[in-house]
C-alpha cells in the first residue's frame, strides 16, 4: 500500500499538486499497517490516518471510523493509537460514521470525558442529538456537559473573531471574470479533484493575466508573486463570478488563496473576494465556504497592492500611506459570524444545534449570534416571488417575505447535473447525509453523456445509486437536459434550487446555487436566503410577425440598456437585475415550455431568480402531461419510484383544487421595465461575446457565419420543427457547419417519427445526442476562431470554442443564418419567417404525454408503489 501510495505522491508532485485523499481500499490497507507498523513509518502512517481520509459519510471514512471504533471498544489494537487517541481522532471526522461510537462512549467511565470534548465541537449531530439528550436526562454527567456546551455555543466561541483590521495583498483581474474563467468547462472532469482543477484557473491569457501555459495552466507565477509579500491574498475584480453556478470556481480561488481545513484533505475555506459587482450565486458560494465577499468600487486597486480592510468600519485604505481607497457596507452583519464559523452552512447547522440544546435545557434564545437586520415593513403589497417564498416559509396565506429578510424556505424540488453532481456527492458526504429531506431531488447526466471521458463513465455508473439510495430520482445518460426534465416534476408556487445556474423554474421559483448549498438543501429540505428585491418586466400589446420568444428574451436587456439600467462596459458596471428577482407578466398565452425560455435567461441577467405569471389552464395542461410522464418513468424502471409517485399524487392534488398565487397590485419593485410588443419589430441578438450586449439584427446584419448551433435548455421541440421546415426548402447542402441537439430523448423520438431527422440529414447537419452538446463547451467545441450563431444560453469568450465570436439568437434566425452563411438582413429574415408564421399551429406543438398512446399505456401498466400520505 505504501509503495503504491508513494508512487502516486510522486506522480502528483510532477503535476504540481498534492496527492488525492485516501479511498476506501487504501484506507483499509492503512488500517492493516497501523495494526503492525513497519519500523520508521510510524509518523507517516499516523499523518495519513489523521489528515488524508475524507470526513463525513465517505466510503473511506466508513473504514476509518470502523477501525477507530474497534480500538475504543477493545476489538482491535494499534501500537500507535491507544483508546484515548482513537476517541480524539473520531472527533475530527465532523459527523456521520463517527457519531454513534462517540455517543456510546459517553457511558464509558474511561473515555466519557474525551468523547464529550469531541462532541462539544461536532455540529452534524442530526437525530443523534436525542441520544445525547436522553443520556443527559438520565443523569449522565458527560452528556450534560455536551448539552450545556452546545447551549453556550462553545463550538463558536472557540473560533477567532474576524479581526478589526485585515492586511491583504491584491490579486487583481481586470474586467469581468466569469465562473468559466475560474473553472473552465473543458476541465469539468477534474472538478472534484480541487488541487488539480485549480491549475486551470485563468488559463486563457487576458489583460493583466499571464498563464504559465496558455490554454492549460493558469498564472501560477503571478499567484506566487503576490503571496510572496507575506500577507493573505484577496481575489479582486471589476465584475466577479458571473455565469454558471459551479462551486468549483470558488474551490479554485480558495485553493490558492484560502486556508487549510484541519483534518480535511484537499479542501480549503476562508479567503477574501472583493468586486465592484459580485454575481449572486458566486457570492453565496463564497459565503458558504467561509470566505469574506464584499462589494465595493475596485477601480483603484491594482495587482500587488497591499491594503488594509476594516470590516467593522467599512473602509479600505492603502497599507503604506493610509490613503482611503473606498468605503463599503457589508451585505449583512451576519457575514462576520459566517466567516468566524467557517462558512454559512456551519453557522446555520451550529446555530440550530445551539437553539435545540437551549430548548432541551429550558433556556431562552441565545444572544451569542448576530441577527440579520429586519427590513421596515412598508405596509404595501407583495410580489409573486415574495408570496411564493412566504408560503415556503409557512407564513399565513397571501403573506410574503419582504426584501432584505433572512429566511429559510422549504425546498420542494432540487436538481443536480453531472458536472456538478460529483462535487454535490462529496458535499453530501461531508454533511453526513444518508437520506434526502427535500421532497424531490433529481440527478441528470446531460453535460457528459455525449463524449464521456473514463472519469465521466465512472460517474455514470456510481452516481445514480448514490442518489437513489437516498430517495432521489436519477435520469440516465442520453435522456437529455436536466431542466427539460426537472421542469416536468415541478409543483406550482413552490420553491427549489439546483446545481446549475439555469435551474430557473417556469412555475414556482428557484434560487440556483453552488454544489455545497444544493447538498445542504437536498439534505435538510431548506435553504438559507436573504430575500432579494424584485424587478418587474411588463409586456403589453401583441407579438409582431416574425418575432419570436427568444427575441423577447433579448429585448429585456436591450430595453434595460436604453433606459440606463444596464451597461455593457465592465468598469463601473450597472445591472439592475444583478442579485434581484426578475418577475415577468403580460404574456398571457404562453405555454409552460415557452415560459421557461424567459425564466431560463434570467441567469444571463445575473438575477437571483425569476417568476412568470401564467394562466391556470396552461399549468393544468402541463401537469396532466407530466403525471403521465412520471408514471411512465416508474414503468421504465426509474427510481426512486416512491418519490416519483409522491410527486405525481401532489400534482393530482393541485389539479383537484387548482389555485395560483398572484402579485398584489400595490407590490413594490426596485424597477419596472415596460416593453410594448408593437415596438419589437425585428429580431434581437446578443453580440459577441456578452449576453448583455443586446442588439437589433439590422445593426449586425451581413456578418459571415461559419457554424450554427441549435440546442440547449433554451430550445424545445417547436424550435426544431421550425428549423426543419426552413431546411427542407434548401436545394443541396448548406454553407455552414450546423449542429442540432434536441433537449430530450422524447423530443428526438418525436422528431424522428415526424420525419425531421431525414431533413436534417439531407441538409448535412451534425446530429448530437439529446443533452447540452456545445452549450457548455466541456466536450465537443466549434472550430477555433469561427463566427457562430447559437441558441445556447451564454456567449462568454472561449465558451463554445477558443477565440470564437458567438451571437445568441432564436432558433429561427439561427436556421436562416445556417442556410445563407451570414446574418440575414431584416427583409431576408422576414421572408423566411413568413413561411414559419403560416405554419405556426403545426410547428409550435408541445409534447403532451397524456395524449400520446405509448406513454399513456405504459403509465397505466406501471407497477405503482404505495406512498404514505
Curated annotation (Swiss-Prot):
Keywords noted in UniProt: 4Fe-4S, Iron, Iron-sulfur, Lyase, Metal-binding, RNA-binding, Tricarboxylic acid cycle
Entry GO CC: cytosol
Gene3D superfamilies, per database record: Aconitase, Domain 2 (3.40.1060.10), Aconitase, domain 3 (3.30.499.10), Aconitase, domain 4 (3.20.19.10), Aconitate B, HEAT-like domain (1.25.40.310)
Pfam families according to UniProt: Aconitase, Aconitase_2_N, Aconitase_B_N
Cysteines joined through disulfide linkages: none
GO MF entry, a single one: mRNA 3'-UTR binding
Binding site for [4Fe-4S] cluster: 713, 772, 775
SUPFAM superfamilies, sorted: Aconitase B, N-terminal domain, Aconitase iron-sulfur domain, LeuD/IlvD-like
Family: Belongs to the aconitase/IPM isomerase family.
Quaternary structure annotation from Swiss-Prot or TrEMBL: Monomer.
Protein name: Aconitate hydratase B
Protein's organism: Pseudomonas aeruginosa (strain ATCC 15692 / DSM 22644 / CIP 104116 / JCM 14847 / LMG 12228 / 1C / PRS 101 / PAO1)
Gene behind the chain: acnB
